[in-house]
Regions:
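Conserved acidic donor-binding segment of nucleotide-sugar-dependent glycosyltransferases
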Residues: 234-246, 254-259
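Nucleotide-sugar-dependent
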Residues: 138-141, 199-210, 224-225, 229-232
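A charged, aromatic-enriched C-terminal amphipathic alpha-helix characteristic of glycosyltransferases
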Residues: 243, 256-319
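Catalytic core of nucleotide-activated saccharide and alditol-phosphate transferases
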Residues: 32, 38-139
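Conserved catalytic-core segment of nucleotide-activated headgroup transferases in glycan assembly
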Residues: 114-188
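Short hydrophobic beta-strand element within catalytic cores of glycosyltransferases
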Residues: 219-223
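Short acidic alpha-helix that forms the nucleotide-activated donor recognition element
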Residues: 183-194, 215
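Acidic donor-binding loop of glycosyltransferase active sites
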Residues: 192-205, 218
């Protein structure tokens, strides 16, 4: 079976599960959950006789206990694949401390760091909504906390087992404007129609939408949370408030009354992103040097960088093959 057909088999839904950062030395990135799910299939197409580096985004918040479970899993994999090398890219400094305490290779590089800022812009358009909430209809998102906002835009879908939560949320927020789904390249258009972005969960990952608001120049009202979205928050343009619908609404209208500068919000967000990207670049630069690679990853970065590092991004397979795989000579199926 060829590499392409093997990958195509587990990318049937056109969801990317890994991305190549470097072919020589071979460096892959993936979400930790996706790596575990697809390890058996990855084994068929990645070489077993040379060192390989994996950089994992950790997804949802990882407690110290969960980090110990990850450490045990890594030890198990190392027994079978001693040439595999693992790095974890953490969404918060707290989580990074847990990983380092456990003796695992890790850096503080929030997955929102790898949003392509060029997909988002500040637009001079009329503000139709007081706030926008880009969030799937799932219990953790706590849509009901937006019930006291007068002009509200909600964008999000739901899974079959979330239908009850969806129906109850729609009943509570029957005044809101709803859109089930918007293509990612157009999401900034809708964000620019709102004054404020909402982030109302208390526990998840870094929440891409939170940073997408900021890159579109929107201030944010957030509740206290675990998961790392606050890595991009600054008091000048974010209000973190208690999970009470009246308090949330008050914060929204205060930001509307005294709006922060949109260009400043975007510029500060990109500054934070670039700082965290540099952490990844520095680590891979060190790998290059130890491998005797006569290249500079800082230069390679501009060539390999893609929105969200290509992870869980819906891209037609022909584009995946030509742009993401780059006709790799390293990734050959085992004979």
């Amino acid at each position: 079976m060829s590499l392409i057909s093997d990958l195509k088999d587990y990318l049937r839904n056109r969801q990317l599960d890994c991305y190549i950062l470097s072919e020589a030395p071979l460096i892959l990135t993936s979400f930790w959950y996706d790596f575990q799910k697809n390890l058996a299939k990855l084994e068929k197409v990645i070489p077993q006789t040379e060192p390989i580096w994996f950089f994992f985004s950790i997804g949802n918040y990882k407690s110290e206990l969960l980090v110990q479970e990850i450490k045990a899993k890594i030890s198990e994999i190392h027994i079978k694949y001693p040439l595999y090398n693992f790095w974890f890219m953490n969404n918060s400094q707290e989580e990074d401390n847990y990983f380092q305490k456990a003796g695992l290779n890790s850096i503080f590089a929030n997955h929102n760091t790898f949003l392509d800022e060029n997909r988002y812009r500040i637009m001079n358009v009329k503000k139709k909504y007081d706030a926008i909430y880009l969030a799937r209809f799932t219990l953790v998102k706590r849509h009901y906390l937006a019930k006291d906002i007068k002009k509200l835009l909600i964008i999000g879908t739901y899974k079959p087992d979330e239908i009850d939560y969806y129906n109850s949320s729609r009943a509570i927020l029957d005044f809101a404007t709803y859109k089930a789904k918007v293509l990612g390249i157009f999401i900034t258009n809708y964000m620019n129609q709102a004054h404020v972005g909402l982030a109302l969960s208390d526990f998840e990952g870094a929440m891409y939408a939170s940073s997408e608001y900021l890159l579109s120049g929107l201030p944010v009202v957030s509740t206290p949370s675990l998961g790392g979205r606050d890595a991009y928050y600054r008091d000048d343009y974010v209000k973190i408030v208690e999970p009470d619908s009246r308090v949330v609404a008050e914060a929204v209208y205060e930001l509307i009354k005294n709006p922060p500068d949109a260009d400043m919000i975007r510029a500060e967000t990109i500054k934070i992103m670039n700082h965290q990207r540099q952490s990844l670049i520095n680590v891979i630069e060190n790998i290059y040097q130890k491998a005797g690679t006569k290249r500079n990853f800082s230069s390679d970065w501009q060539r390999v960088f893609i929105h969200k590092l290509g992870l869980r991004t819906r891209i037609p397979f022909p584009i995946y093959r030509s742009r993401i795989l780059r006709e790799s000579r390293v990734l050959q199926p085992k004979k």
